[in-house]
Amino acid sequence: MREVNFSIPNVNKASVNITTTLYDRRALDCTSTLPLINSLNHLAYLTTSSARIRDILTVDGGIERLVCILKEGRSGDLMEMWKWSLAFQCVVNIGVRGSESVRTRVVEADMVPVIATILDNYIKVVDKARARADSESHKQSSRHHPKSVPAPSDSSGRPAFLEQSSASENRTSRRQAPPPSIEIPPQPLFIDVTSPPRVPMTSPPERSTFGQDVHNHRTNDTRYAHPSHRHRTMQPLATALPPMDTADGFGLRPVRDNERLPSMLPALHTGLTSQPDSPTTPNAPVQPRSIAQATHARHRPSLRQQLSASGESDDGNGESSTMEDESTPAETAEPIVGLQNRMDIDDVGNREAIIGGVSESHDLTVTDPSEGQEAETFNITHRSTVDGSMINTDNAQNNAALGLSPAQAADTATSPALVPSPYSLYFRDRSTAAAQGVLTTMPRDEDVLMSLQLLAYVSKYCNLRSYFQNSHFVPKLKIDRELQMLEEGTSPIEPAEEEDEYLLPDDVNIFPLVEKFTVRHHSKDMQYWACVVMRNLCRKDEARGGIRQCAYYKCGKWEETARQFAKCRRCRRTKYCSKDCQKAAWVYHRHWCHSTP
């Protein structure tokens, strides 16, 4: 029999392939990577648009061949990665868009172990990244702890570090001409060493009179070469503000209209940013932040100012997310500042770069580059019906990539879901060549998202639940060896003997893996699809008389009669056979337990 890789003269092709108008099962058996990629690329289109092609793949062994391609593992070669991603996309299209019989065939083709391995690999990387971030933060806090001890005072009651500061200023004044005399306001009791007390704390037109001399004097001073104490940055800010009523908001007075317009401060914008002086500029909220850091006169803008400056609508009828129990009230007090583009206190060491005009990013809306246009495909929240002309396109695109609406960006500004990808955090400060080589074998965010979405569609059939609760990991897809190679101080691992997948016991329950993605440090889209999968676990089996299973994965007991187990009082969806199971499951169930009306 002729090999399919041999040439076919009548069609002038090197091998059999799939086109957008022709499906040939023999093309999936091609052993050459390039024509197989070409066929998979066209097959991804066919599985999206043609229900007949999806049905044919379930009976001619096409799904089994695609799953075999996935189980071969992800290689570091670019062409192999491309082939793996296209095959995975085809299987997801078949499972998501197919009928019940087609989805059943996807599960029976042993696709669940592939998904379980992808989710487990991602969880391992996230756990290592969080552990590494916690250790680094602990080291930094312990390193800066001795510096936070108050300095001893001399006999006159003046702190010793102020004496050293004045002595350093005297030595500097001998080497260069003194700067112009500027009126200095009264010093607070605990003033920050690194805060320049040369700028008078007056109204905005008077604050815009400082020149470049102040910056030149600071750059020549050796006291600003090292990072300053972060613990003392709050005190000068509190003392620099005039006395005010603490009854409303955070003790901040409402900002006047002449202060909230960026066009009222033309001198402060020169050299700091190239954006036009307009309240609708997308990066307008960053400008008051830089001004406040340079002058230490922090006037917090109101809620209406931040919404108008970022291009968002002032109305409060944005949609309530399906993942949150709390809804944003329509009427909000004026001085509330807990928004996405609020002005937090950064490290004082970064003020040099801000005043000097150095291009250093201080945006708070950190987005993962991998969550760009692709993530929009899996956006699951319902958009708000506000006028689109009032929404900033830049902010809306960033929020859409995370599955959020612009009206809800304020509620989740400080959510850990806005952190960069765990891979970028984990591979930071590591060998670039080794990190990039291992990164290619790890699942991407979109792979995890598509896996959860596929599970959400196939897990709602109770007759397939045994496939999810009794699964295993694919040995060629596991990344334990790659992760251990990146650990500091570890020797290269000898390649272990390859395990036979069909000899592994089916002792992996995929639902506990999915439940970990309901935690809030994952993206909103991952949380949504993971919650859908967990709610499918609580479905009653109509084929067995409408009985339900205990929602605690270590129990798994089924009801003997309908309505035997008690439901969760909050969500009215999950059932537990006992109080002990409910208490044990609450560790993760609280993340996807949402009250029903």
From Swiss-Prot:
<dbReference type="GO" id="GO:0030435">
    <property type="term" value="P:sporulation resulting in formation of a cellular spore"/>
</dbReference>
<feature type="compositionally biased region" description="Pro residues">
    <location>
        <begin position="177"/>
        <end position="188"/>
    </location>
</feature>
<dbReference type="GO" id="GO:1990304">
    <property type="term" value="C:MUB1-RAD6-UBR2 ubiquitin ligase complex"/>
</dbReference>
<feature type="region of interest" description="Disordered">
    <location>
        <begin position="268"/>
        <end position="287"/>
    </location>
</feature>
<keyword id="KW-0749">Sporulation</keyword>
<feature type="zinc finger region" description="MYND-type; degenerate">
    <location>
        <begin position="552"/>
        <end position="593"/>
    </location>
</feature>
<feature type="binding site">
    <location>
        <position position="571"/>
    </location>
    <ligand>
        <name>Zn(2+)</name>
    </ligand>
</feature>
<feature type="binding site">
    <location>
        <position position="589"/>
    </location>
    <ligand>
        <name>Zn(2+)</name>
    </ligand>
</feature>
<dbReference type="GO" id="GO:1900735">
    <property type="term" value="P:positive regulation of flocculation"/>
</dbReference>
<dbReference type="InterPro" id="IPR002893">
    <property type="entry name" value="Znf_MYND"/>
</dbReference>
<keyword id="KW-0963">Cytoplasm</keyword>
<dbReference type="GO" id="GO:0005737">
    <property type="term" value="C:cytoplasm"/>
</dbReference>
<protein>
    <recommendedName>
        <fullName>MYND-type zinc finger protein samB</fullName>
    </recommendedName>
</protein>
<feature type="binding site">
    <location>
        <position position="568"/>
    </location>
    <ligand>
        <name>Zn(2+)</name>
    </ligand>
</feature>
<feature type="compositionally biased region" description="Basic and acidic residues">
    <location>
        <begin position="214"/>
        <end position="224"/>
    </location>
</feature>
<dbReference type="GO" id="GO:0008270">
    <property type="term" value="F:zinc ion binding"/>
</dbReference>
<dbReference type="InterPro" id="IPR051664">
    <property type="entry name" value="MYND-type_zinc_finger"/>
</dbReference>
<feature type="region of interest" description="Disordered">
    <location>
        <begin position="133"/>
        <end position="230"/>
    </location>
</feature>
<comment type="similarity">
    <text>Belongs to the MUB1/samB family.</text>
</comment>
<comment type="function">
    <text>Involved in determination of the onset of polarized growth and morphogenesis. Plays a role in the regulation of branching in hyphae and spore formation.</text>
</comment>
<dbReference type="Pfam" id="PF01753">
    <property type="entry name" value="zf-MYND"/>
</dbReference>
<dbReference type="GO" id="GO:0007163">
    <property type="term" value="P:establishment or maintenance of cell polarity"/>
</dbReference>
<dbReference type="GO" id="GO:0006511">
    <property type="term" value="P:ubiquitin-dependent protein catabolic process"/>
</dbReference>
<keyword id="KW-0863">Zinc-finger</keyword>
<feature type="compositionally biased region" description="Polar residues">
    <location>
        <begin position="271"/>
        <end position="284"/>
    </location>
</feature>
<feature type="compositionally biased region" description="Acidic residues">
    <location>
        <begin position="312"/>
        <end position="328"/>
    </location>
</feature>
<feature type="region of interest" description="Disordered">
    <location>
        <begin position="292"/>
        <end position="341"/>
    </location>
</feature>
<dbReference type="InterPro" id="IPR016024">
    <property type="entry name" value="ARM-type_fold"/>
</dbReference>
<keyword id="KW-0862">Zinc</keyword>
<keyword id="KW-0479">Metal-binding</keyword>
<feature type="binding site">
    <location>
        <position position="593"/>
    </location>
    <ligand>
        <name>Zn(2+)</name>
    </ligand>
</feature>
